[in-house]
Amino acid sequence: MVLNCCHFQVLDILELYRRIYEEFLAIPVIKGKKSELEKFAGGLYTTSVEAFIPNTGRGVQGATSHCLGQNFSKMFEINFENEKGEKAMVWQNSWAYSTRTIGVMVMVHGDDKGLVLPPKVASVQVIVIPVPYKDADTQGIFDACNATVETLCEAGIRASADLRDNYSPGWKYSHWEMRGVPLRIEIGPKDLANNQVRAVRRDNGAKVDLPRDCLLKKVEELIENIQDSLFNAAKQKRDACVQIVKTWDEFVVAVSQKKLILAPWCDEEEVEKDVKARTKGEMGAAKSLCSPLEQPEMPEGTKCFASGKPATKWTYWGRSY
């Protein structure tokens, strides 16, 4: 009964980590269980969310949720008095989510211009930049920028205006693009005259003119769309790297092509050690990343890709950070 409670808590925490990655950071991850060789030393088992960096062909252990059982309570004599008045060993879980997450986000979404931040985690979601021309109503443009920021902030959108007069608009564009701000709003004389603003997306560079009388609604829609687009683009790139293999020769080719490999495995520790040894090279050895909790169907008679023994599960493999 207690072990079941521990198991459910492990999965509950793992789901929270998946939500952080996918719903906030717009990074697709795989929920899975680690092999005995890769699990937390001393624990009963380890689950993880695994991310993948298509540009480098490497996996990243995004976060872990461990069931420790009573192993450590026995080791350190951690007791409690149960409802029967008897001494009993505690059951423990452990979970971890570290700053490597920031690095994963940068590598998954970033481009040659700099950071690309998902709106849900961006400290500044919208940057408003005045674009005054010679002999233009500079003060009117600045006032419109401030009014725009005020409107957005009142609605809970994290917005700011860059009103510095010692930098050109073009310099400011590059400055905020490098910092990954999801949406840029430009206001110039023509925009002022037409009661509109120009919005520019960081993720794809798309530009659109927005009427000021429905600005808030349009900005909210853009922010939501940017968040969804980042996740969908990242998932499409990740999925394009997934390769199913069933033989050792196919596995070796997929490793050389920096793929995220899904293969049938016999779940034997010595076989995994052999895979590491046989793929060791300048880029590092391939290893098991996780066995997905949602297992694809295993056809009867399927053999392990590495040993030829009967396969018991599907497992993701690849090089990793």
Which residues are covered by each model-predicted region?
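NTP/phosphate- and nucleic-acid-binding module
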Residues: 1-321
